[in-house]
From Swiss-Prot:
InterPro entries: RNA_pol_su_RPB10, RPABC5/Rpb10. It comes from Caldivirga maquilingensis (strain ATCC 700844 / DSM 13496 / JCM 10307 / IC-167). Its EC number is 2.7.7.6. Pfam families: RNA_pol_N (PF01194). One of its GO terms (biological process) is DNA-templated transcription. The gene is rpo10. DNA-dependent RNA polymerase (RNAP) catalyzes the transcription of DNA into RNA using the four ribonucleoside triphosphates as substrates. This is DNA-directed RNA polymerase subunit Rpo10.
Length: 67
């Protein structure tokens, strides 16, 4: 839902790489090539960025609780 700040497995900081990765992939570049250019070489880190799905906009309306 929210972009992971660190890799779940090794703990490497990844939050700063999400926007460049997403923008380049949406522009039509190959995700593997983008990760190589961003120097993301570990399988665990690549998996964290590749498998992330942004659902925050769909979940936000359900988080409001009125009293």
């Amino acid at each position: 839902m929210i972009v992971p700040i660190r890799c779940w497995t090794c703990g490497r900081p990844l939050g700063h790489l999400w926007e460049p990765f997403r923008n380049r992939v949406l522009a039509g570049e190959d995700p593997g090539k983008v990760l190589d250019d961003l120097h993301v070489t570990r399988y665990c880190c690549r998996r964290t960025l590749l498998a992330h799905v942004e659902l925050i906009n769909q979940v936000l309306p359900y988080g409001l609780i009125e009293k």
